[in-house]
Amino acid sequence: MTLRLLFLALSFFSVQVTENKILVKQSPLLVVDNNEVSLSCRYSYNLLAKEFRASLYKGVNSDVEVCVGNGNFTYQPQFRPNVGFNCDGNFDNETVTFRLWNLDVNHTDIYFCKIEVMYPPPYLDNEKSNGTIIHIKEKHLCHAQTSPKLFWPLVVVAGVLLCYGLLVTVTLCIIWTNSRRNRLLQSDYMNMTPRRLGPTRKHYQPYAPARDFAAYRP
């Protein structure tokens, strides 16, 4: 009898724990290429005729509230993003979907869904799920498209500058060669001209009158 009562008590307690918690399932990983993602959170609870709150949190400890929406099945909830995020959402009887856009690599993190039953009492929320890692890839497409456009003009400019530099170099070499040749020719011409070492003195013989030897003949 005692064992039977204990078993009934444990069964009742387990049912109460299950009923007081909402189970939420999420995809373990989402890879984002276009800066936009939709995260679906499946819950195991009938939210019909209940006022509920659906929230999305960022971080291992759910420190940052990304987006939140309140509503019921009578009217669509209005989702409000937190600062630094852009979000919207919708829900049905099994799933709440959060749509995020304008994401960048800094938004890469783990995200958790939270479902709360606000009314009627008692208050219920979900057990923390395993979360979803959202990985936002860096965009390299724009660089890949613009690189060829910038590459060829740079090649043309570099080619023009190279040709101009070669032309200037060749011109300067020709001018320098001609100038050197002219200097060598002028130097050779100057070497062929006789040089006068200085004024020359004329040596004059002393004057002696000529003798007439015929006058002395007999």
UniProtKB/Swiss-Prot annotation:
It is found in: Cell membrane. Glycans are attached at residues 72, 93, 106, 130. GO terms for cellular component: cell surface; external side of plasma membrane; immunological synapse; plasma membrane; protein complex involved in cell adhesion. This is T-cell-specific surface glycoprotein CD28. The chain crosses the membrane at residues 151-177. It comes from Rattus norvegicus (Rat). Phosphorylated by LCK. Dephosphorylated by PTPN11. Keywords: Cell membrane, Disulfide bond, Glycoprotein, Immunoglobulin domain, Membrane, Phosphoprotein, Receptor, Signal, Transmembrane, Transmembrane helix. The modification Phosphoserine is found at residue 187. Homodimer; disulfide-linked. Interacts with DUSP14. Binds to CD80/B7-1 and CD86/B7-2/B70. Interacts with GRB2. Interacts with PIK3R1. Interacts with PRKCQ. Its main location: membrane. Residues 20-150 are extracellular. Pfam families: V-set_2. Residues 178-218 are cytoplasmic. It is a single-pass type I membrane protein. The modification Phosphotyrosine is found at residues 189, 207. Residues 1-19 form the signal peptide. GO terms for biological process: apoptotic signaling pathway; CD4-positive, alpha-beta T cell proliferation; immune response; negative regulation of gene expression; negative thymic T cell selection; phosphatidylinositol 3-kinase/protein kinase B signal transduction; positive regulation of CD4-positive, alpha-beta T cell proliferation; positive regulation of gene expression. GO terms for molecular function: coreceptor activity; identical protein binding; protein kinase binding. InterPro entries: CD28 (IPR008093), CTLA4/CD28 (IPR040216), Ig-like_dom_sf (IPR036179), Ig-like_fold (IPR013783), Ig_V-set (IPR013106).
